[in-house]
Amino acid sequence: SPALADEHNDNFLRF
């Protein structure tokens, strides 16, 4: 996710 570019683990946003 662009908003979480720092932490490339946006898995928790992929609900």
Curated annotation (Swiss-Prot):
Residues found modified as Phenylalanine amide: 15
Localization annotation: Secreted
Gene Ontology cellular component terms for the protein in this record: extracellular region
GO BP annotations listed: neuropeptide signaling pathway
Covalent S-S links between cysteines: none
Keywords per UniProt: Amidation, Neuropeptide, Secreted
Top-level lineage group: Eukaryota
Stated family: Belongs to the FARP (FMRF amide related peptide) family.
Record's function text: FMRFamides and FMRFamide-like peptides are neuropeptides.
Name of this protein: Extended FMRFamide-12
